[in-house]
Amino acid sequence: LRFTEADVASFNKVVKTHTNEVYTLIGSKATHANVYSCINQVFAKATTNDAVMLFFSGHGYPGGFCCYDMNKTTGGLTYTEISSLFKQCRAKCKMVFADACFSGGLRKEKQGNDATSSVRNGDIMFFLSSRTNETSQEMIGGPNGQFTRFLVRGLRGGADTNRDKIITAKELYDFVHEGVSVATGNKQHPVMWGRFNNSMSVLNWNVK
């Protein structure tokens, strides 16, 4: 993968128009211990009036995401760990965006049981770049993965079909899914799941 750090920069650029509370780990700093600790600390600060977002770009495997120190037995951030962190977080809305191969298989770690059911406090949404058996493709020449390309474009207003300045979960899914599917010749299909309403607000893109 050539553009994972560029994916992070592109996503951060959108989010930073809304908040200064953005924490980034890339390259050798993105070890499992550092990633877990950072998520834990940030989530612990969140109040019931907040929304939290976790963005990941890199290699994935059925059941989790690969950190910098990933090996055959350790170094992966698992769905169980993410679910546990979400369960402890008081934020009203929790979202995961992942541009990673096989990321749609994340929920399979629970063998079909959706771990989001244990997260009772607030909405929880996973938006993942590909199905269980699919790789996540990058743009020829960059600068991003196809999922990040359309995710960022959608959050900047492209997904706002009714032009009310609010990007809902349904609008974002429809926009990104169509864009990625077409761009990859139907070889990649983003998936969205969790516990939330289709009308859940993901982002207000008209921030001044």
Q: Can you annotate each of these PLM segments?
A:
Residues L1-K208:
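Cysteine endopeptidase catalytic domains of the caspase/legumain-like
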